[in-house]
Amino acid sequence: MAMLQRQTYINDIVNRLSGLASSVELRGLLNLLDLHVISEDFYVDLLNLIYGWKLRNANSLQQNAPGIDLVDDSNRILAQVTGTSTKGKIDHSLKEIPEKYTGYHFYFVPIVIDAKEQRKYKYNPPHEVVFNPKTDILDIHFIANKIKGMPNIADIDTIAMFIKNNIQNDVPDTTQLTSGLNYIISQLAEDLSLIHI
């Protein structure tokens, strides 16, 4: 039964995160960037839940912090949350990292489904900043796989509830829809069996 619940959680997580990505992309094309800013705070909590980090929004520490959006000083982690997933954006983010973050680990968090193209490139992080594009680009596909691989269903439940509480989704719950349809079909079959022709 836990395997079925795991799948239900993962399906809901994927639906909600991909819905967020679509909204961020479309709103970005329309130059409506409010969701980009709100997403930074969402990702602070999401990444802290998944990885056990202590990220804070860097923009609350310094208005429009260059190159980074999220900081965890105790674990020496930096992250850039963006609706843009290009090599140029990663290069620019790395270039803008202040020297005071020498030796920190940098994560690029594009709010897109799949940023696999960006993993193919070579990057030159400054100030001995650690950045491996194969493991440090946290797109939705990467994050969903990370959650899916968690051994503890209670952790997945916590993350799924956090996402559900933060991302409203107009996609109907197919599990409830299917069980509702099954009920209607069984009732119709029962009613039809009572009709004598």
Task: Describe the predicted segments one by one.
Residues 1, 27-31, 127-129, 144-145:
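Charged, low-complexity surface segments at secondary-structure and domain boundaries
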Residues 2-58:
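Acidic-basic catalytic patches of nuclease active cores, encompassing PD-(D/E)XK
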Residues 8-12, 102-114, 153-166:
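Short secondary-structure transition/capping segments
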Residues 14-21, 90, 180-184:
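Generic hydrophobic, helix-prone segments enriched in Leu/Val/Ile
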Residues 34-98:
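Catalytic centers of nucleases
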Residues 82-141:
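Catalytic cores of nucleic-acid endonucleases
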Residues 123-193:
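Charged, structured surface patches that assemble and position nucleic-acid processing machinery
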Residues 195-197:
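Conserved small/polar residues in nucleotide/adenosyl-binding loops
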